[in-house]
Regions:
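C-terminal motif of bacterial Sec signal peptides marking the signal peptidase cleavage site
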Residues: 14-17
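Beta->alpha turn/N-cap motifs
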Residues: 35, 62-64, 74, 78-88, ...
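Periplasmic-binding protein-like
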Residues: 102-113, 138-145, 202-267
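A conserved helix-loop-strand patch within extracytoplasmic ligand-binding domains
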Residues: 101-151, 251
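Short, polar/charged alpha-helical segment
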Residues: 27, 34-59, 66, 70-72
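Pocket-flanking alpha-helical
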Residues: 64-95, 110-112, 117, 140, ...
């Protein structure tokens, strides 16, 4: 009797395991940044359900510090918030085994101001707020160099820091802040310009195309990506999510949500 009961329990566990596996194949947990990017991901979620029967569970984050850690430790199946230079730096810094498995959008970084309309109006000693994470900090410095506001060491690559500045003719004060804080400092009387990723613009009502003082050009290497663990890159639910994200429905929604500030990176 005990043997029979044990066999029945084992069979039940095996069946439960099979059911769970089947359920997971049609379920994916994806990390996104709260706000506009999550709004876009909601459209991908709808497409995934309609086209593939895939249930997408979106997990919102307020900043860029936690999604990769959660993905690396299996708390998320994938995330959608970063570009390749950011991923490379995070993998190197934390020993993550994360890989890019698909492109999403290029979100141009640009300089915004409530005080000036052009670079020519920027006064000596002005304060410019930039992101403080290594890759977007470097991206902002390269943008400032492109506007001839600073000069950087030759061959500095994509990850310059303030220590790589070799010339600062206007003696600009460069303030490093968490990316999510940058839209709020536009109203700070001490800040003249904030360099902000399109990701964090929704709350401001600003358009990178129409409202920026200066902006990255179309050749930016910073296309955003879908990221997962190396051992999960061939999972069917990941492939179906990518196909759902890279859809006309998502591209159209992003065009509206980001007011023209999201360029599809898969076309």
């Amino acid at each position: 009797m005990k043997l029979r009961l044990g066999a029945l329990l084992l069979a039940g566990l095996l069946l439960a395991g099979c059911d769970q596996s089947g359920s997971d194949a049609k379920h994916i947990k994806v990390g996104v940044i709260n706000g506009a990017e999550q709004d876009v991901a909601e459209v991908a979620k709808k497409v995934a359900k309609e086209k593939f029967g895939l249930d997408v569970e979106l997990v919102g984050f307020s900043g860029s510090l936690l999604p990769n850690d959660a993905t690396n430790h299996g708390e998320l199946d994938a995330n959608v918030f970063q570009h390749r230079p950011f991923l490379a730096e995070d993998n190197k810094a934390h020993g993550y085994k994360l890989v890019a498995v698909g492109n999403t959008f290029v979100f141009p970084m640009a300089g915004y101001s409530r005080k000036i309309k052009s670079v020519a109006e920027l006064k000596d000693g002005a304060t410019i707020a930039i992101p403080n994470d290594p890759t977007n900090l470097g991206r902002a410095l390269l943008l400032l160099q492109n506007e001839k506001l600073i000069a950087l060491k030759p061959d500095v690559g994509l990850l310059p820091t303030a220590l790589d500045i070799t010339a600062n003719p206007k003696k600009l004060n460069i303030m490093e802040l968490e990316g999510a804080q940058l839209p709020r400092v536009l109203d700070d009387p001490k800040v003249d310009v904030a360099i902000i990723s399109t990701t964090y613009l929704q709350q401001t009502g600003l358009s990178p195309v129409h409202d920026s003082v200066f902006i990255e050009d179309k050749n930016s290497p910073y296309v955003n990506i879908v990221v997962t663990r190396e051992d999960n890159k061939d999972a069917e639910n990941v492939k179906e999510f990518i196909q759902s994200y890279q859809s006309p429905e998502v591209a159209k929604a992003a065009e509206t949500i980001f007011n023209g500030g999201a360029v599809p990176g898969w076309e």
